[in-house]
Amino acid sequence: MGVSDDDRIAAAQSYIDGLVTHNGDAVPFAPGCIRIEQGIKTGLTGNHLRRSLNRGPQYRVIAATTKPEYTINGDEVRAVYNVLTKASLGGRRVAARVDEAFVIPAAADKATIQHIRVRFHPFAQRI
């Protein structure tokens, strides 16, 4: 049957929304989903990632994201967007340009996130 590109993008968007709302309950993680951030494994399982979104202090500083630009290549859904934090100093807010790749197989019965790989580049944004 397969999963549509729109459903795969919606699964990735639910993760990005969870970063801002600090609620990972609606994110369709596969049980064995892992997350690699800047080359380091930071997510061990789907449940671990969900708990991190719900209660992790590392996500509490996130205030908003910009609308992601999505591209799809095979089973990979790539999202490029900015994360805006609550942290600011001297009229500038800490932000980061994020390039995140989600493995969400097209041939599956439903859109579930199998793997996340993220790279980000911090910058200061005028408020």
For each feature predicted by the language model, list its residue ranges.
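C-terminal and inter-domain tail/linker signature
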Residues: 1-127
